[in-house]
């Protein structure tokens, strides 16, 4: 039977399912490249159909979002269901293979659902349905449980060293692999990223396991502490200063909702002002974003400059970078979330937010290459952009972990999993 005959032989239900999946795949690509500002009309055009025809399959953009997030959670749950973890592996190598295989599966799943994954990092748009809110806030408990089982099996097989908080390590492992879908790594194959990241988490980036007492006294760590002291301690804003007040409100809204879907109307409502008043004070949403991020960028750059310019080993600098990121997370959480979204995709009308990411990558690549040359660092092809991006990702401790175990606990966690690795040496 030819292609035309096969198409005619498909039942109406199969045809509808296939067409819906085509629309969902197209919408996912558009959301991933242009954000949630993509309209139904743009989705219809990309699908080669009229907007009216799209409504035969989905009655709203939210309906598409709901199904995209449902597909993501369903696929991630299937990854957890498919994995067969042996509680007592034959050897440490077998235990490591279990962990790495699961890590790769999570990364592949995340890469295939980037738009839905990114959506779960923010609050749903204003007026979202209860179903969409519930889906966006759903935790990936099944995959965390599967990873925890694999790590516990690794401990039984004498791969994983004792004394680690394995539920926290499991959460970190899963989040690190899920971040592969956030496009920080751009076009790099998910398996390649997962190989580097799981290798670091298991065996550490440091050739020799560093002592925490020595790291606390490093020039890099002390330099970051001095930079953090210069940051303002209070977020209290004088509401009579409308420009400062609007920046404060917009910072929260951009961090909570995401820049792309936050409107001037949303900012005005949150600030208790009229939309016209907001425009008169800030000019445009883009100008407001730039002014918010400029201060954050200057402080972050000062921190990285202090780290990379210190008289310290590469390992000491990476440890200090983790402490910098932990403090950034605590003090500039909204800006941090906005920055992550910007690294995924810079809106074309905003040429720069002030953060010199290419320059940071260049400096870090040189530092990593020097660390490998000095036999302080274990990292394949350290001078590549991918290696630097993987290292930057490892310096970011997930926000929920920082909140759960505190700043110093998060620093110890970073030293345990990033610098030393969880495997016995």
Regions of interest found by a model, annotated:
Residues 1-10, 108, 145, 149-157, ...:
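C-terminal peripheral helix-coil segments that are non-catalytic and often amphipathic
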Residues 22, 26, 30-67, 71, ...:
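Helix-turn-helix
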Residues 36-37, 160, 377-378:
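Conserved hydrophobic residue
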Residues 67, 81-116, 166, 306-331:
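Hydrophobic alpha-helical connector segments
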Residues 70-77, 294-301:
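Short, basic, alpha-helical segments at the C-terminal edge of helix-turn-helix-like DNA-binding modules
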Residues 107-134, 148, 329-351, 399-400:
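Amphipathic alpha-helical segments used for helix-helix packing
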Residues 129-157, 166-170, 174, 178, ...:
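Amphipathic alpha-helical packing segments from all-alpha helical-bundle domains
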Residues 327-424:
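C-terminal structured domain segments across diverse proteins
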């Amino acid at each position: 039977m030819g292609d035309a005959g096969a198409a005619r032989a498909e039942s109406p239900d199969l045809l509808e399912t296939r067409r819906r999946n085509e629309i969902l795949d197209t919408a996912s690509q558009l959301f991933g490249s242009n954000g949630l500002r993509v309209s139904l009309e743009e989705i219809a055009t990309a699908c080669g159909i009229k907007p009216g025809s799209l409504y035969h399959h989905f009655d709203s953009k939210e309906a598409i979002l709901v199904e995209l997030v449902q597909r993501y959670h369903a696929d991630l749950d299937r990854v957890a269901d498919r994995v067969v973890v042996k509680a007592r592996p034959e050897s440490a190598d077998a235990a490591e293979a279990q962990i790495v295989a699961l890590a790769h599966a999570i990364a592949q799943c995340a890469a295939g659902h980037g738009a839905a994954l990114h959506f779960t990092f923010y609050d749903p748009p204003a007026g979202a349905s209860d179903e969409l809110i519930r889906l966006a806030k759903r935790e990936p408990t099944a995959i965390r449980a599967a990873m925890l089982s694999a790590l516990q099996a690794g401990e039984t097989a004498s791969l994983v060293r004792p004394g680690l908080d394995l539920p926290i390590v499991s959460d970190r492992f899963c989040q690190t692999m899920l971040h592969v879908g956030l496009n920080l790594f751009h076009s790099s194959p998910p398996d390649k990223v997962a190989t580097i990241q799981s290798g670091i988490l298991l065996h550490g980036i440091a050739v020799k396991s560093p002592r925490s007492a020595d790291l606390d006294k490093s020039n890099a760590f002390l330099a970051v502490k001095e930079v953090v002291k210069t940051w303002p301690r209070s977020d209290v804003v004088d509401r009579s200063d409308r420009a400062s007040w609007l920046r404060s409100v917009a910072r929260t809204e951009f961090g909570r909702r995401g820049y792309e879907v936050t409107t001037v109307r949303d900012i005005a409502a949150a600030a208790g002002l009229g939309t016209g008043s907001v425009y008169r004070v800030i000019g445009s949403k883009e100008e407001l974003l730039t002014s918010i991020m400029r201060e954050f960028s200057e402080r972050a750059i000062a921190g990285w400059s202090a780290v990379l310019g210190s008289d310290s080993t590469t390992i000491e600098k990476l440890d200090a970078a983790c402490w910098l990121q932990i403090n950034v997370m605590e003090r500039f959480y909204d800006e941090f979330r906005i920055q992550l979204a910007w690294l995924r995709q810079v809106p074309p009308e905003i040429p720069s937010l002030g953060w010199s990411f290419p320059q940071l990558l260049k400096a870090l690549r040189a530092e990593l290459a020097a660390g490998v040359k000095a036999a302080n660092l274990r990292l394949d092809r350290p001078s590549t952009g991918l290696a630097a991006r993987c290292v930057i990702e490892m310096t970011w401790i997930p926000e929920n972990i920082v909140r759960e175990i505190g700043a110093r606990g998060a620093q110890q966690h970073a030293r345990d999993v990033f610098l030393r690795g969880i495997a016995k040496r």
